C-alpha cells in the first residue's frame, strides 16, 4: 500500500468521522513507512488519534508504544488495520493488558484498500 493509498484511506476515514461529528477537526498526516495518523480535536481540544496501518506498518517497533502512550494519557485511540490482521493485533494488545485501544478494520468501516500489503 503506497503513500497515495494511505492518503485516500485517511480522506475517507476523516470524511466518515466528520459526518458523525461535525464539530470534529481532523489533521491528517502520512508517516514514514506508509501509515497514516489522524489527530482528532473537538473545539480545539485534543480528543484522540486514529492510526491507519498496513500489513507492513503494523509491525513497526514503536507502534504499540505510540498506541499505549496516547491511551494512557487519556485519549481515544483507534487502530485501523486490514481484516487479515485484526485477530493478531487485537490479541497482541489485550495480551499486554491494555484495553483502552480500539482495533477496527478498513472493511468494517466500509473503506476498501486497493491493496493490503
Where does each model-flagged region fall?
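A structural micro-motif
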Residues: 24, 75, 99-101
Amino acid at each position: 500500500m503506497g503513500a497515495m493509498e494511505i492518503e485516500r484511506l485517511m480522506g475517507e476515514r476523516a470524511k466518515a468521522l466528520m459526518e458523525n461529528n461535525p464539530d470534529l477537526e481532523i489533521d491528517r498526516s502520512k508517516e514514514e513507512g506508509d501509515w497514516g495518523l489522524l489527530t482528532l480535536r473537538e473545539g480545539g481540544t485534543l480528543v484522540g488519534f486514529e492510526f491507519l496501518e498496513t500489513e507492513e506498518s503494523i509491525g513497526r517497533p514503536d507502534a504499540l508504544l505510540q498506541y499505549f502512550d496516547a491511551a494512557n494519557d487519556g485519549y481515544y485511540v483507534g487502530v485501523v488495520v486490514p481484516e487479515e490482521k485484526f485477530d493478531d493485533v487485537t490479541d497482541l494488545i489485550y495480551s499486554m493488558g491494555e484495553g483502552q485501544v480500539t482495533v477496527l478494520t478498513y472493511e468494517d468501516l466500509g473503506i476498501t484498500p486497493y491493496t493490503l500489503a
